[in-house]
Each structure stands twice: as structure tokens, then as C-alpha cells.
Amino acid sequence: MKYMITSKGDEKSDLLRLNMIAGFGEYDMEYDDVEPEIVISIGGDGTFLSAFHQYEERLDEIAFIGIHTGHLGFYADWRPAEADKLVKLLAKGEYQKVSYPLLKTTVKYGIGKKEATYLALNESTVKSSGGPFVVDVVINDIHFERFRGDGLCMSTPSGTTAYNKSLGGALMHPSIEAMQLTEMASINNRVYRTIGSPLVFPKHHVVSLQPVNDKDFQISVDHLSILHRDVQEIRYEVSAKKIHFARFRSFPFWRRVHDSFIED
């Protein structure tokens, strides 16, 4: 089996990476960072997100595993003390694949410029490049509202525990193939109104954000943030692609939520 290990880059994570590579050397395991079947991330959820985007073109062929060397993460749920056990289980191939939905973001520009497509594991946000943020929200080609405020956030089910939660969005179980739109400081008064609530969209629904005046936006996809100019439309939909995790034991999503936000 081919595998690769990525590290946060701190001393603890780098040492654990070297020890695991040495451990895999006792089994029929080949280190391959070009076409791995298993990708192990050592660090935290940020390190895991980087690993995901590094291999997002090969998601169907890869199963991911996260080891946290700091706080418990939603994607990095193995502890360093369990690394030897993980090596043995992986070498025996004793795992199941669990899949989570992803978010597809398509940015369309003015005439003469090719559209850009992005894949998110957590979320995508849209903010103004400097002026007022005003967009028309269109759902399945039907105008829903004109939004005025600081910005909008569209998240995956697993990503609802990240930025979405801080915006007051609901937490969604990753078995639900959906996406959630939350507002950032919307303007609501006698003249301007928005729905004022998070919106959950099922698979096959398409949400389009269309500029009203300013066409320059700061668009983020997970940890990547880029200034996009002359934007004509931003489209969100549940991706046909999924991320696959190698699971060796039961660790229910709601237990993970409890341990992360209530008590460990």
C-alpha cells in the first residue's frame, strides 16, 4: 500500500512523522507522495486542510487520516500516543472508508476570462473588496433576496463546526448531503431586509450570488483567500466529489462536537 505523511512542521509533528515512516518500514508499505492511497496528516485541522487541497484531484483514490499534536480537531482525531497502533492497523488494511460531502464554488467573470472552480472541505466566504457588499441571492434561478452586509458564508456539513458556527449557523451531521448559507452582519431596517436566518440547501440546489454594483470580491475557500475582479456570478452547489476517511473505530460526530465545544 502506498502512503504519504504530511506534518505541521513543528518539532513534535516532524519527529512523529519520522517515527511512523520507520514503523511502516517493517511492513509492505511504500512511501509515495505522488500517488498515495493513504494520506496521513500530523498537526491539526489546518494541516489537514492543506493535505486535502494538495490531493483534491485524486480524492477517489485516497483515504485520509488525521493525527492531532495539539488540540482535538474534527479531522485530526488520533493522538500521538496511538501512532504505533495506527501503523499496525494500516499495515493490515483493517479500516473502512467514510465519506463526507464537499462544496463546489464556481466564479464566473466578465467577457474573455475563463471561469474558476474551487473545492472546499469547510467553507467558502464572500466579502467586498472594500466598498459596500451588495449581491442578489438567486436560488435555482429564482430571485430570493438582495443581501446587504459584511458578507456571506457557505459551508459544508463538516464545515458547519468552523466559521459557520461563529456566525450563529446550525451544526449539520456530515451524513447529510447539503450546504448551509449564513449571513455576516446583514443590514436590516425599514428599507433593507434579508431573511436573517441560516439557510440549508439540499443536494442538486444551486445558489447564485450576483453583484449589484461592485464586482470585485474577496473570496475564500477554506484557508485560501483571493481577490477576484470583474466577477459576474458566484455559484455554490454540493460537489459530486467527496472526501474519504480511513476509519478504524467508532468516533461519532456528536461526540466530537461535545469534546471540542463542551468538554473533553
UniProtKB/Swiss-Prot annotation:
Protein name: NAD kinase 1
Functional description taken from the UniProt entry: Involved in the regulation of the intracellular balance of NAD and NADP, and is a key enzyme in the biosynthesis of NADP. Catalyzes specifically the phosphorylation on 2'-hydroxyl of the adenosine moiety of NAD to yield NADP.
Gene Ontology CC terms: cytoplasm
Stated regulation of activity: Competitively inhibited by 5'-thioacetyladenosine (TAA) and di-(5'-thioadenosine) (DTA).
Main subcellular location of this protein, as a coarse class: cytoplasm
Residues reported in the UniProt entry to bind NAD(+): D45, G46, N122, E123, R148, D150, S158, T161, A162, Y163, N164, K165, S166, H223
Effect after changing H223E: Twice less active than the wild-type. Its activity toward DTA is increased 2-fold
Complex and partners: Homotetramer.
PANTHER family membership: NAD KINASE
Organism: Listeria monocytogenes serovar 1/2a (strain ATCC BAA-679 / EGD-e)
HAMAP family given in the database record: NAD_kinase (MF_00361)
EC number: 2.7.1.23
Active-site residues, record numbering mapped to chain: D45
